[in-house]
Amino acid sequence: KEETGYTLTSWRFRGLVTFVTEAENSKTVEYMEYMCLYTADGFTGEPTACDEGELAWVKKEDVLHLNLWEGDKIFFRLLNEDEPFFSLKLRYVGDTLAEAVLNGKQMELFEERSGDGMPTGTIVERGVAHSEGRCHGTAHIWIARANEKSGCEVLLQKRSAWKDSNPGCYDISSAGHLSAGDTYLEGALREIGEELGIHAEAEELKDLGLLEKVSHGVFYGKPFHDHEVSAVYLY
């Protein structure tokens, strides 16, 4: 009420958010804060001048397009998706998001990339990347072998039914997202090892170049905007 002039008449306690900020060149914790997160759908009163900043009504679907901290975008996404009560820990190194933990489980973080595959320096959470269509990196590894009858065979993988994109479809031999800090080659070697148990050496992967792909769809009732720059390899 002090900052907005509104008196709440209906609200929900949605989650706890922990913010931790570390110095850029050390693991020294410079700042730590715990935030109780509420949403309200009932209030009375009139807006008042706010000495903390300027008040403005924003459509829910437009919030993620504002200039927000990357960690803030995570809890706004969770609220928009009506996530049950949650505990979210956000750790920053300087101004850069370094870790996000939801209900004790690490969330996937990507490096945002430009169209040529180079990292921009911004770290983005997987769900935010796919809800906003933020460009990120993936590695595609095609596995081929000689065949006396046809000349060549290519190994395909059938995607699990629980995948968020193209479930149950046949796909590349091995593919996956690059985690924040990965090079394309590091991501490719990790994926082929984790998915297929092939412990390849770097020199065994032939670099075929970069492929940019943009697609839009709906998965599990949620908008899905995918913008990838993929390094393609042949094993």
For each feature predicted by the language model, list its residue ranges:
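A glycine-rich, hydrophobic loop/mini-helix early in the fold
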Residues: T138-H177
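NUDIX/MutT-family hydrolases
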Residues: L37-T39, P47-L79, A98-Q106, V232
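Active-site segment of metal-dependent pyrophosphate-handling enzymes
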Residues: G5-E46, A161, E195-Y235
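Small-side-chain secondary-structure face that scaffolds active or pore-lining regions
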Residues: K1-T4, A188, I192
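Acidic, metal-coordinating catalytic segment for phosphate/diphosphate chemistry
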Residues: Q106-K149
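Acidic/histidine-enriched, glycine/proline-rich intrinsically disordered or flexible terminal extensions
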Residues: F85-M107
